[in-house]
């Protein structure tokens, strides 16, 4: 159980009305934070995990840098206005990508209505602040926030047909504006983009690679690694696969040994590199192999 300090209980903004001195399960507070944007629950969790709210914020800033959020600095854990507290839509999207890696987040983010039972027996209703959970087909996560200074904000995610999109809206004029704008972004993305499978691990490469000093004259090659790109519909032909392969390879080789690579080029810019490996093993050529090469296999059959 997590103890609730006076500091946590005294948080303004969205809250679940925690009582100072009560203790609640960690999962209850986490759910309150994800579903109800509860600032008091957020501070209570931070104090529990790191000993103080400030140490929690310090760790948030460290993690932001680890995630590449170069234009973000946290002064508090709640998002309430403070000097030096800032972020960008791109950084919020990066943070959302990280959140999507955690199944527990999805478990709570899709809850529409719930409640918190306090130690005293008092009950606080929880309503998901992300209306798109109910109103937009495929939306299964997101976080809202609003202050006079920042306006109405949301980072939401939706998935259709195996393609997941993230929409970030900052500074909307009203709550409905942020939801409408995010929904419009999703509509545009799903209508105009698709996932294009560029490479599949294990796919054979056309032709074979000559082998020097091996018991086989050549071997098959295959790709090692999957690559799928999010592309505007109708632009798939702009992707090029440019091989970087030697004229031959030297035996011996095990299956899976690196041989070369394939560059993935989009509009003249290299965006990825996929390893090319041996699709079969080849040993060194022995005396009998040499004779077979010279005189023909019929002598040994």
PLM region spans:
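Active-site-adjacent loops and short helices of periplasmic peptidoglycan-processing enzymes
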Residues: 1-90, 94-103
């Amino acid at each position: 159980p997590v103890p609730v300090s006076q500091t946590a209980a005294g948080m303004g903004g969205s809250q679940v009305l925690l009582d100072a001195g009560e203790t609640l399960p960690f999962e209850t507070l986490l759910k309150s934070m994800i579903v109800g944007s509860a600032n008091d629950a957020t501070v209570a969790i931070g104090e529990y995990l790191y000993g103080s709210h400030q140490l929690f914020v310090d760790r948030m800033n460290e993690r932001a840098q680890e995630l590449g959020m170069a234009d973000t600095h946290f002064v508090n854990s709640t998002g309430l206005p403070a000097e030096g507290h800032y972020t960008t839509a791109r950084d919020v999207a990066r943070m959302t990508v990280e959140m999507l890696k955690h199944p527990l987040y999805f478990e709570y983010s899709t809850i529409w209505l719930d409640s918190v039972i306090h130690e005293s027996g008092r009950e606080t209703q929880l309503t998901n602040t992300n209306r798109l959970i109910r109103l937009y087909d495929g939306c299964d996560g997101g976080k809202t926030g609003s202050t006079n200074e920042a306006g109405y904000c949301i980072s939401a995610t939706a998935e259709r047909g195996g393609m997941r999109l993230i929409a970030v809206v900052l500074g909307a004029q009203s709550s409905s504006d942020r939801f409408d704008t995010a929904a419009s972004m999703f509509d545009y993305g799903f209508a105009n983009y698709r996932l294009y499978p560029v490479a599949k691990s294990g796919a054979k490469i056309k032709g074979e690679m000559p082998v020097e000093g091996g018991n086989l004259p050549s071997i098959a090659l295959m790709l090692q690694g999957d690559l799928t790109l999010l592309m505007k519909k109708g632009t798939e032909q702009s992707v090029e696969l440019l091989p970087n392969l030697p004229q031959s390879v030297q035996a011996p080789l095990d299956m899976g040994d690196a041989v070369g690579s394939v560059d993935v080029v989009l509009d003249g810019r290299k965006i990825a590199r996929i390893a090319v490996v041996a699709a079969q093993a080849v040993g060194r050529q022995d005396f009998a192999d040499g004779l077979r090469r010279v005189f023909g296999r019929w002598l040994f059959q």
